[in-house]
Amino acid sequence: MRLEDLRPTPGAMKKRKRVGRGPGSGHGKTSGRGHKGQKARGSGKVHIWFEGGQTPLHRRLPKRGFNNINKKVYAVVNVKVLEERFEANEEVTPEKLIERKIIKDLKDGIKILGDGELTKPLVVKAHAFSKSAVEKIESAGGKAEVI
């Protein structure tokens, strides 16, 4: 085999289609776009959400509900997490929860929920508590303080 014997794989050297270059080219006049209509135009894209002119689904369905601007979104922490991550008589604060990667950010505050058991006395400082969480913290000899 010599260098001049090398040939590209059949089908690898496809000619590009030159459109709009006269009737003899096979792609003249309308350039393969057919006659008139939106898709024959220069910027003739039909957007993916277009439904052919009928009223789109999102406008046919009624509006429902609203977003409450006063809603508080709390970062929630369960009592069982405090049991695992804190020693007895330790103070639990939002800063310590972020530092120990129990929560990512404060949001509108921290709410302690009562899932799991608590055996160690802890001083827990948070923005909100569930009733069951307060009961479990106080029955373990700890204190629940709202900040």
Curated annotation (Swiss-Prot):
Record keywords, A-Z: Ribonucleoprotein, Ribosomal protein, RNA-binding, rRNA-binding
Entry-linked InterPro entries: Ribosomal_uL15 (IPR030878), Ribosomal_uL15/eL18 (IPR021131), Ribosomal_uL15/eL18_sf (IPR036227), Ribosomal_uL15_bac-type (IPR005749), Ribosomal_uL15_CS (IPR001196)
Gene that encodes the chain: rplO
Pfam families listed in its UniProt record: Ribosomal_L27A
Subunit structure: Part of the 50S ribosomal subunit.
GO process terms (BP): translation
PANTHER family, A to Z: 50S RIBOSOMAL PROTEIN L15 (PTHR12934), LARGE RIBOSOMAL SUBUNIT PROTEIN UL15M (PTHR12934:SF11)
Cellular component per GO, a single term: cytosolic large ribosomal subunit
Keyword flag Nuclease: no
Entry similarity comment: Belongs to the universal ribosomal protein uL15 family.
Function description: Binds to the 23S rRNA.
Regions of compositional bias (Basic residues) in chain numbering: 30-44
Molecular function (Gene Ontology), one example: structural constituent of ribosome
Organism: Thermotoga petrophila (strain ATCC BAA-488 / DSM 13995 / JCM 10881 / RKU-1)
Region feature Disordered, mapped onto this chain: 1-45
Name of protein: Large ribosomal subunit protein uL15
